[in-house]
Amino acid sequence: IVTDAHARLLTARDVLNRAEQAVGLRARDDVEHAQTGTSPVLLGPAVRSELIRLLIDVCPSEGWIGVCGVGDIGWEWASQQGMDLDRVLVLNAGKDHQVGDLCSLLIEACDVVCLDVPELSSAQQRTLAARARSMGRIIVTLRPWPGLSRDGVRQRMRLVV
């Protein structure tokens, strides 16, 4: 279902993309994926409205967002902000499931994966980060991954010229 707001958002993104290309600006996605040695793991904000904005901002147009273990998203508000809910996969993994394997599948299927999974070990976190880096994916985690996660809000505010 395409709402008027969503259609306007897509039109605006298309116009901005053409304007950026006309003046020689590179898309944020092109620059971030071109950087080497940076972690693909962002520490997401606790405030849900900021988290939704971050997910929308780091997801490429026509990209997919995967969510696992994150509660109280506020899907209606997310849709109003421009998140295409037809391109969102949600996994609610129980404690009996192989959570690391499920997160790995989300990384294979989605451009941006948002995780709030306390069951992941440090080794699983490193494996998921390496897989995300090799596939050009971004992980937004709501729990710090020592040595891997970086502040997502601060990264998003960087200007690319």
Give the ranges of each region predicted by the language model:
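Short, solvent-exposed polar/charged micro-motifs at secondary-structure junctions
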Residues: 51, 100-101, 151
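Structural alpha-beta junctions
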Residues: 60-64, 85-86, 132-139
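Long, charge-dense
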Residues: 64-128
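Detector for small/aliphatic-rich hydrophobic stretches
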Residues: 1-67
